[in-house]
Amino acid sequence: SLDDAEGDINISLNENKIKVAFGNFKIISKVIDGTFPDYTKVVPKNNDKNFSTKTNDLKNAIDRVSAVAINEEMKSKAIKLILNQNKLLLSVESQTKGFADEELDVNYNQDDVEIGFNSKYLIDICNEVDGEDINVSILDSISPAIIMDKSDENSFFVLMPMRI
């Protein structure tokens, strides 16, 4: 295993490939030459509706509410978020299994807004956030949201909404 490998690490590089060798292990990869895309163009700059809450509270509420859609023939697990004064209402509607909703206390005192997301993507993002608190910035129901770990503002996620 890699943990047991001892000795020197040899690195070889040519125009097309890079090779890293240590012990009995060799890793060979193709070298890609190109310009990294300008990701700043997809990061929204004017999301003015912000709310924050506990990361685990949000993740657990999404998980509970989206359970209504489990095992359905759905392309995605759409969840609706409705924000109003210090409240976040999460809801899922299933054609065969009914309706589920849950309300969370959040820090929010701006205009009401309603937006839909894929619940799986929201849970995946919550799982990647290390901090206790999460911040979500929204412009409107059709623009991407920015989701940030409040303890690490260098790490953020851009999530496209869904029509519900």
Regions found by a protein language model. Give the residues of each.
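DNA polymerase processivity clamps
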Residues: 1-32, 47-164
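Active-site loop ensemble at the mouth of alpha/beta enzyme cores that anchors a bound cofactor
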Residues: 33-41
